[in-house]
Curated annotation (Swiss-Prot):
The active site is at H19 (proton acceptor). It comes from Chlorobaculum tepidum (strain ATCC 49652 / DSM 12025 / NBRC 103806 / TLS) (Chlorobium tepidum). Pfam families: Pept_tRNA_hydro. GO terms for molecular function: peptidyl-tRNA hydrolase activity; tRNA binding. Monomer. Its EC number is 3.1.1.29. It catalyses: an N-acyl-L-alpha-aminoacyl-tRNA + H2O = an N-acyl-L-amino acid + a tRNA + H(+). NCBIfam families: pth. The gene is pth. GO terms for biological process: protein quality control for misfolded or incompletely synthesized proteins; rescue of stalled ribosome. This is Peptidyl-tRNA hydrolase. The record marks D89 as: Stabilizes the basic form of H active site to accept a proton. It comes from the Bacteria. GO terms for cellular component: cytoplasm.
């Protein structure tokens, strides 16, 4: 069993923003599955995938407190770190680029930073989705909370299903395979 966590902010006003790309990938994977409240501040659904069951989680905390929900879900389902994949936005990666890593630093992503602090380890897989632009504003917080332009949305709509495929490959074939196959520019 794998725990797949998509990072985002819970309020409706944050839907379809750069910061909520993790939620978008989780929703794509979930399809018509319904989400339930977990024992902790998160919503989840289970799906069956070629590599076995996947628990899809959306923390209902704000991004910067995502670690609380991740730890609660891991404890509830007794998930080890090697069976965890976190999906998040990354402003330091060009729009439309996927970067999967088996471990590493937060790289300035505050949701990842809190998860690392909460777990006491950087040893978990992450799938970063590039949301950066050429003309980044001085205020990164307003940038990540902004919606994509129409042109950017066309690219993101191509990236989300590729990210979902990468998650399925991570679950069935492992992080190294997913890295080799999916790391790079999608659009």
């Amino acid at each position: 069993m794998k725990l797949i966590v998509g990072l985002g902010n819970p309020e409706l006003r944050h839907a379809a923003t750069r910061h909520n790309i993790g939620f978008d990938v989780i929703d794509h994977l979930a399809g018509s599955s319904t989400f339930s409240s977990g024992k902790g501040n998160y919503r989840f659904t289970k799906i069956t995938a070629p590599g076995g069951p996947l628990i899809l989680v959306k923390p209902m905390t704000y991004m910067n407190l995502s670690g609380h929900a991740v730890v609660a879900a891991m404890n509830f389902w007794k998930i080890e770190r090697e069976n965890l994949l976190v999906i998040c936005d990354d402003v330091n990666i060009p729009l439309g680029t996927i970067r999967i890593r088996a471990k590493g630093s937060a790289g300035g992503q505050n949701g990842l930073k809190h998860i690392i602090q909460s777990l006491g380890s950087e040893e978990f897989a992450r799938l970063r989705v590039g949301v950066g632009g050429e003309n980044m504003p001085a205020s990164l917080s307003s940038f990540v909370l902004s919606k994509f332009t129409a042109e950017e949305r066309k690219c993101i709509d191509k990236v989300i299903p590729v990210c979902a495929d990468a998650v399925l490959d991570f679950a069935s074939l492992g992080v190294e395979h997913a890295m080799t196959k999916y790391n790079g520019q999608v659009c």
